[in-house]
Amino acid sequence: MGRNSLCPCGSGRKFKKCCASKAQEIGNFPIQFLKSELIRKYKIRFKTPEDINGIRKAGRLALDSLDMAESIIRPGITTEEINTVVHEFTAKNNAISAPLNYRGYPKSVCVSVNEVICHGIPGSRILRDGDIVNVDVTPILNGYYADANKTFFVGTPGPDAQRIVDITRECLRQGMSMIKPGNTTGHIGWAIQSYAESHGCSVVREFVGHGIGFEFHEPPQILHYGQKGDGFLLLPGMVFTIEPMINIGARFLRILEDKWTAVTNDGRLSAQFEQTILVTENGYESLTPFD
């Protein structure tokens, strides 16, 4: 393709006056051209500074919701009580809980205890000393979505609980450390899988991270396993979640009769942490930052 050819981004302009004029490049391709290809082929929706600010505000509300949940977690409460507190807090802040009625999900929050990997439906289950409990929140604030979750200790954790939570939190950090323009989603998955398996744990493969911001789930999918170079190229303006689910035993799972709750097949512990991430010009920014 010559510089006087029509730009392949579809603008109708000559390449030299369109994508070739952009200063930033990855692999000899202008970033704007690479973005246009991802938009055209995979419907990835890049975010403007205004969008990012809106998602960041929703992200702050997500973190405040998790803090609210943490403040009541103790032995003796039910998972339904966590749902009620977060639902009311979200509504009080003029936001909507995205999970409620999403594809038929009946609650505002996912609350997953011990062997529950994800999508635990809040109800009458009572938290007990030594449990671990994941709380997953997704507020919609002024039309923007943000997604975050944490796994909390209930009372005093045992050795296995401490181990799986520490390893899972570090898996998220390892995945985030791979985020920069020019890397791929496969770099993220590789880092998570490598760390988990090197510590004798396994990565759940049936559930993935995802684009977010304008909708609850957008392209691309972010696998928590894989190889460097696999998947989609990371480019500035992408916003997606990383949410590794790590099992202390085997990675296999089953879905309960409610058609939502995923549990470890061997009944052993599973933990998860999640943040909403923006790819920046030089790396990344968490829009739901926590340690």
PLM regions and their residue ranges:
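Short Cys/His-rich zinc-binding micro-motifs
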Residues: 1-16, 20
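Active-site neighborhoods and metal-handling regions in enzymes and metal-associated proteins
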Residues: 11-13, 22-291
